[in-house]
Amino acid sequence: MLASEVIQAYEAFCPQEFSMEGDSRGLQIGTLDKGIQRVMVALDIREETVAEAIEKGVDLIIVKHAPIFRPIKDLLASRPQNQIYIDLIKHDIAVYVSHTNIDIVENGLNDWFCQMLGIEETTYLQETGPERGIGRIGNIQPQTFWELAQQVKQVFDLDSLRMVHYQEDDLQKPISRVAICGGSGQSFYKDALAKGADVYITGDIYYHTAQDMLSDGLLALDPGHYIEVIFVEKIAALLSQWKEDKGWSIDILPSQASTNPFHHI
């Protein structure tokens, strides 16, 4: 079958046009007009991902984070980042990117986060189109800030969790309304605040932004960017279901390579 058939099914679920303005999306490397036998799902395209794809004979990678997100000035093999692109092209591996559209689409990444944490009666944080938006906010079983932090740490299997608060008393504050945005969602914290969030969960919170959040009366949890790795398992499961429903004769492989650059001691 053609790679384009897989992507046609994917875009019926998660249209490219749902992406935020200026986002990197869609086919970035190779062609979809080719026969494929193996599709791999990954969070990132790094050296480890490419090596795995080559070893396993992968023809198409569906990835969340675009490998090309800065202007390319040359393709000199002496630059490690360029070698990633060169190896993909050399081995005829197509790369398709699904970034903010999977964050925004219904039953996409942010809804999966809500299901994992028990956040219910949700709506989006910021509108990005007709009846759709980025981030989610909803209600959760009443608990303390500390209890929510422990739940987040356990659910996402984290070795550490950054908590945004000043006073020890904050740990016992009652929490019932929670906002969440995968990735780097600090720019939406005022939307979370405006919609009544007690706590905002997002990654990559800056030092001064954390202070601003607290001044505005909003607690926060920063589990990091890598919680988005559930993209791999979830999309691989969807592709496997479509394979069964549509009779595709291809292999679906969730990437086993860890691309998390952070570890804590």
UniProtKB/Swiss-Prot annotation:
- Report if keyword Metal-binding is assigned: yes
- Record Pfam families: DUF34_NIF3 (PF01784)
A cellular component annotation (GO) from this entry:
cytoplasm
Question: Where is a divalent metal cation 2 bound in this sequence?
Answer: 65, 225, 228
Q: Would you identify the family this protein belongs to, as annotated?
A: Belongs to the GTP cyclohydrolase I type 2/NIF3 family.
Q: Which domain of life is it from?
A: Bacteria
Give a yes or no for keyword Plastid in this entry.
no
- Residues the record lists as binding a divalent metal cation 1: 103, 228
Assembly behavior: Homohexamer.
Arranged from A to Z, the UniProt key words for this protein are: Metal-binding
* GO molecular function terms attached to this record: metal ion binding
Q: What's the protein here called?
A: GTP cyclohydrolase 1 type 2 homolog
